[in-house]
């Protein structure tokens, strides 16, 4: 059994080691990167042995004064988003959602130009139907070929070569179009929309 004096001295020694050893454990702590009040970025740096990272969220330096110490946990808390950063991120997200919603609406709303364009591209053969009765069709004449030139060389993409020169017939100028004065006009003239016209 140890003497009574040593039993009383042991707790005092442990407390003294804790009080004196705490600065040694905390010494050499690093200062993490930070942004100053102007928004300028400052890289992190190491403090020498027996010095601590001191200062505020916006200004850091190495010192030996424990009252000015800023712990690593406090430094990391300073890195949390500021109100300006949160407002910037929120406005960017809102702007992105607005652009996406506008684009979707323009492709789905019938009053929008992009919707009409998309409908025209999907159905190119649909549209206003114009009756073709009463309009004479002129015959199509082949382009005259020079008999001295010989057959034309085959064009790329065509499988069958030409079968030789086309037979030559006397070319006559096209006559006047067939016109029937008794036929009704190809359209109906509009009726006046007000009486007495």
UniProtKB/Swiss-Prot annotation:
Residues 1-27 form the signal peptide. The keyword Membrane applies. Keywords: Membrane, Signal, Transmembrane, Transmembrane helix. Its main location: membrane. GO terms for cellular component: membrane. Residues 109-197 are cytoplasmic. Residues 28-87 are extracellular. It is a single-pass type I membrane protein. Pfam families: Shisa_N. It comes from the Eukaryota. InterPro entries: Shisa, Shisa_N. Belongs to the shisa family. This is Protein shisa-4. The lineage of its organism: Eukaryota, Metazoa, Chordata, Craniata, Vertebrata. The gene is SHISA4.
């Amino acid at each position: 059994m140890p003497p009574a004096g040593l039993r009383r001295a042991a707790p005092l020694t442990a407390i003294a080691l804790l009080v004196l050893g705490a600065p040694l454990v905390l010494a050499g702590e690093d200062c993490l990167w930070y942004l100053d009040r102007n928004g300028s970025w400052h890289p992190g740096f190491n403090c020498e042995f027996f010095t601590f990272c001191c200062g505020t969220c916006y200004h850091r330096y190495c010192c030996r004064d424990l009252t000015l110490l800023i712990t690593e946990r406090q430094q990391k808390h300073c890195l949390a988003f500021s109100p300006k950063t949160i407002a910037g991120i929120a406005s960017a997200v809102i702007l992105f959602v607005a652009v996406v919603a506008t684009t979707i609406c323009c492709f789905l709303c019938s009053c929008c130009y992009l919707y009409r364009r998309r409908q025209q591209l999907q159905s190119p053969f649909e549209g206003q139907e114009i009756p073709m009765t009463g309009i004479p069709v002129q015959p199509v004449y082949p382009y005259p070929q020079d008999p001295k030139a010989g057959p034309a060389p085959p064009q790329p993409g065509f499988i069958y070569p030409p079968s030789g020169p086309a037979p030559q017939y006397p070319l006559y100028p096209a006559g006047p179009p067939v016109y029937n004065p008794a036929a009704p006009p190809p359209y109906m003239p509009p009726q006046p929309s007000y009486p007495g016209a």
